[in-house]
């Protein structure tokens, strides 16, 4: 049987080879048979694309394209969609240029498309008005400051988010930046040679729509400025201070915009502990809308420089700190009592200091819901804050609303020595979250509408899915 199968296979292959040779010589089937017979697969695929395009309503095409924009490699797919027909081109081009993905090879063609002429009045590209997000973070040595300035000038009418490149952003870019009146996000954190801070603040001070502002890490070194004369954008919500921010700057900051909701202080090698504390108690504490604070990568802070931060900022809901600058005393009630005599704090709402201090509960931080612990890279800090320290603070009532603890993996809470303690802390947080669900408080107030927890679910469905576990516990992240 095996020999018969082998012989049959050999004969079949020989027949196929002979048939291919005849087809190549023009032999094989008669011409009429070829015309009426089955077509090859390549011919079928080719003829499918040469027929008239299938008409689709614009609404359906837009739905398809909006789905494509959520994919990882959407730019290549959107470019292909532009080649299908005029209808697809008109629908896909705005999405293609709204958030272009820029890297080394495509940067020069992008610049030539956006800026076909140096003189704006000679040739103007209509595509420049479609750019809403200009992210140049992937560019290192491509381009030069003059090209960045030209791009900002061409996209000034529509640009909403700008991430500056490392080496091609300079003083001459500020003129174009100041004209981007719709700008909402300005990220200069990667800039290696930052323009002078007074000129930078002057350029962005009148941008009414600016919500997020990240200062360059290289800015402010080698010069002393008067920060009291700096004007912040009036509607700023997210601010990141970094670079050569020193004690002179931090002591001079009088006020931040009351609209500020998130503040990050990082990568400030000249800032010392007393200057940070002064900033927190004079300029940050009066911010009633502030919800999130992050402090990390501050090499001149001492090992206990931020132990008073919970007392200084009772309004904070999310706190992210590097354990390099705190000790377990940050949760200790005796340390809270000591802080009353250590600081003379400004009033939160215009009341006298004595009345304000009497109104604040010294042993509780009633607003903190999320605590994030990171590591700035210094060795030997892994055991400064342990899960037991946080559980003791919860048991003593110092952190009554804490529900989430996020910990960098470099702190080794997942190791065999502390893994059981971390699990016990997670159980405590989840149990407290379940009580919130039962009482309808916190994120579960009003059926969870405030945080999207349990939204459009009845009570039984919420209980079946254990929605309280979605918003409470201990999470590890890379860092």
What are the residue ranges of the model-derived segments?
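Leucine-rich solenoid repeat modules
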Residues: 3-8, 12-13, 18-26, 30, ...
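Short, contiguous pre-domain boundary segments
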Residues: 40-49
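Hydrophobic regular-secondary-structure patch
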Residues: 49-145
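Residue-level signature of the C-terminal ends
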Residues: 67, 71, 91, 95, ...
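Feature marks extracellular polysaccharide-active and adherence modules
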Residues: 67, 103, 137, 165, ...
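Hydrophobic beta-strand segments of well-ordered beta-sheets in folded domains
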Residues: 98-100, 129-135, 159-162, 183-186, ...
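Leucine-rich repeat
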Residues: 115, 139-289, 300-311
